[in-house]
């Protein structure tokens, strides 16, 4: 029976991928807009009374639910210079009946409180454990040892045991892993619907490989990739690198992300996924799952526009965010290089967090997942997680969490109204990122980030700021259509396709020419080249045909007549939703612009009211308004069919932040 359900789910996922029906169909997967919190279960004996103790606090502090994440035992010393403690602490064994039982109890008790209860689909970050066989483990080109195959032993529930990370390019490896995980979670899947979570990509990506890849590559591209692999990231091999990355993306999306989403649906669940860091066409990956999720601050807020765009293109209501991760920076060693500096942990300030939340709302996020709450036994609140703010009974945030949660709930409720509104689709330069290879400007805050393929710093062109532009990739364009001279994707229609890319894939160019011939206005800001090793004479012919059309121009807005949704000097970041004839604008306080990791302690401090004179163009009307931002306040403006503006009450005054923690 389960195999039939899985087949049906795979067929459904294929229809979604083809753009035949809407993924999610605008369905809300969470019963409320209240924030959830990630809830770290450290590897130990988990007791029912402790589960109840934690969940009661969650309920009483304005949360909508939890996401249970299984991680390391507390004796392992991850961030100290001395050797790791490898003594084995007692715990419910991973995926054992005892483990399944206590997980099911947590779900049942959450249900009794009216809380959502999601689960990570594994332990640690990437999927894997000690039961993964070597033939199912992740691979890289010319492996010299197994060091890159192991799970992050120091973050796994099974620590100090080592297990393999699954091969994300082999669906059979995923299927075998998923069967075990689904069986262990089965008792907990009863009751309300639980989301199943996949974290951001933390698998070795450099020269990622799988059995049969070489043969598949030759069939697809007509040449042998093997001679290029040792130097695939060199500048000389940019075209070969593009072909390699394109096939890797197809493998990962079709053999991991789509199967994961299908598996979740077959279990009566839904997928919530971070595709950040994956070697993929991000729009294709994020559109394949039910609830696309971003994260901040390890990915800065503007990145979230990619995630929210994927939701918009497939009519998904929710865009979630793992929020407040490493807000003040990733923990670092102290001056003596002996211990990690955790002095700000537990001293976080809610005004600083509001800066981050508002920046996310202005980039399309409408469901907050706190990062997060460590599991603490009854009467204890001294256990903390290393890379997050502290959600718990003690710490600087404790007294402010209920009111802050109420604020975020209110904003998210408004920003789930109707659908995202935009009139401009902007081409996501995936091809450029793959041709570029290594990051042009490595991030000293995040030395593990090395490839442009992550698109960490990709933002829309400055001239589109007032248009609330939506990213679309060349690969996803084939799922769209043109009707009445407009680009149609799910519930969304766009009057203009804006392209500012150095490279465009041949298949994408064919689609663009076809759409332009049907009347779609295209802004082609530069003359692109064909990526990949195999050049086709068709490319230049198509480009000549495209640039010769009257509805194709190098200028924007040019003769399109399209006005920006919002116009004004020093325009703040904003997001727009439309519900029937009503428009909802979330306009972030200007202090939420240009946030970078790490935030300074007390960066949110402000004493001045800021005014922006803004012009709104909706429903054929031009509305000029002075918009006032009091200290720490953002704005939601509702504009009705007749152009009547209404400021919605989302006021929340956090405590004035300190600028020095000690």
Residue ranges and their predicted role:
Residues 27-44:
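Boundary/entry segment of secreted carbohydrate-active catalytic domains
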Residues 85-87, 161, 442-446:
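A solvent-exposed, charged loop/short amphipathic helix patch at secondary-structure junctions
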Residues 1-8:
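Bacterial N-terminal signal peptides that target proteins for export
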């Amino acid at each position: 029976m389960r195999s039939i359900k899985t087949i049906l789910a795979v067929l459904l996922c294929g229809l979604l991928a083809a753009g035949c029906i809407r993924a999610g169909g605008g369905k809300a997967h969470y019963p409320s807009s209240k924030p959830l919190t990630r809830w770290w279960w450290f590897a130990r004996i988990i007791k029912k009374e402790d589960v109840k103790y934690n969940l009661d606090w969650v309920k009483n502090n304005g949360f909508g639910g939890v996401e249970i994440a299984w991680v390391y035992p507390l004796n392992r010393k991850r961030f100290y210079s001395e050797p790791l403690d490898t003594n084995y602490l007692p715990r419910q064994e991973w995926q054992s009946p005892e483990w399944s039982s206590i997980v099911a109890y947590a779900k049942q008790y959450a249900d009794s409180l009216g809380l959502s209860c999601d689960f990570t689909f594994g332990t640690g970050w990437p999927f894997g454990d000690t039961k993964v066989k070597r033939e199912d483990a992740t691979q890289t080109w010319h492996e010299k040892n197994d060091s890159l195959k192991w799970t992050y032993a120091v973050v796994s529930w099974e620590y100090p045991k080592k297990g393999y990370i699954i091969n994300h390019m082999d669906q059979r490896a995923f299927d075998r892993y998923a069967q075990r995980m689904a069986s262990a979670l089965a008792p907990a899947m009863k009751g309300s619907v639980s989301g199943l979570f996949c974290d951001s990509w933390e698998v070795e990506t450099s020269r990622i490989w799988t059995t049969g890849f070489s043969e598949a590559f030759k069939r697809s591209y007509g040449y042998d990739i093997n001679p290029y692999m040792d130097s695939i990231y060199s500048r000389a091999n940019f075209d070969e690198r593009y072909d390699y990355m394109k096939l890797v993306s197809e493998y990962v999306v079709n053999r991991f992300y789509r199967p994961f989403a299908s598996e979740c649906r077959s279990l009566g669940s839904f997928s919530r996924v971070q595709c950040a860091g994956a070697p993929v066409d991000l729009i294709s990956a994020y559109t394949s799952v039910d609830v696309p999720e971003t994260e901040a601050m390890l990915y800065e807020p503007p990145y979230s526009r990619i995630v929210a765009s994927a939701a918009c293109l497939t009519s998904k209501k929710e865009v979630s965010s793992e929020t407040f991760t490493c807000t003040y920076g990733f923990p670092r060693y102290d001056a003596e290089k002996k211990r990690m500096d955790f002095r700000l942990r537990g001293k976080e300030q809610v005004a600083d967090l509001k800066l981050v939340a508002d920046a996310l709302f202005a980039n399309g996020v409408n469901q907050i997942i706190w990062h997060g709450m460590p599991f603490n036994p009854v009467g204890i609140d001294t256990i903390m997680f290393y890379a997050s703010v502290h959600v718990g009974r003690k710490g600087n945030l404790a007294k402010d969490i209920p009111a802050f949660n109420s604020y975020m709930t209110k904003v998210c409720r408004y920003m789930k109204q109707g659908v995202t509104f935009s009139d401009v689709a902007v081409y996501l330069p995936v091809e450029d990122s793959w041709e570029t290879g290594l990051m042009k400007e490595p991030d000293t805050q995040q030395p593990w980030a090395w490839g442009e393929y992550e698109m960490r710093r990709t933002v829309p062109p400055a001239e589109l700021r007032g248009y609330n532009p939506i990213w679309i990739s060349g690969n996803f364009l084939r799922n769209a259509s043109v009707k009445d001279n407009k680009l149609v994707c799910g519930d969304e229609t766009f009057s203009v396709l804006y392209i500012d890319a150095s490279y465009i894939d041949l298949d994408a160019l064919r689609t663009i020419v076809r759409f332009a011939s049907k009347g779609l206005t295209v802004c082609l800001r530069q003359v692109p080249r064909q990526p990949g090793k195999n050049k086709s004479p068709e490319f230049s012919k198509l480009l000549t045909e495209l640039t010769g059309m009257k509805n194709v121009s190098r200028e924007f807005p040019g003769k399109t007549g399209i006005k920006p949704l919002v116009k004004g000097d020093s325009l703040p970041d904003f997001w727009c939703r439309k519900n029937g004839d009503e428009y909802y604008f979330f306009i972030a306080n200007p202090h939420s612009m240009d946030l970078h990791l790490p935030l300074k302690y007390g960066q949110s401090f402000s004493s001045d009211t800021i005014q922006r004179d803004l012009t709104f163009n909706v429903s054929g009307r031009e509305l000029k308004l002075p918009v006032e931002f009091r200290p720490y306040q953002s704005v939601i403006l509702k504009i009705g069919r007749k152009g009547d503006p209404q400021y919605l009450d989302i006021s929340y005054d956090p405590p004035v932040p300190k600028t020095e923690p000690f």
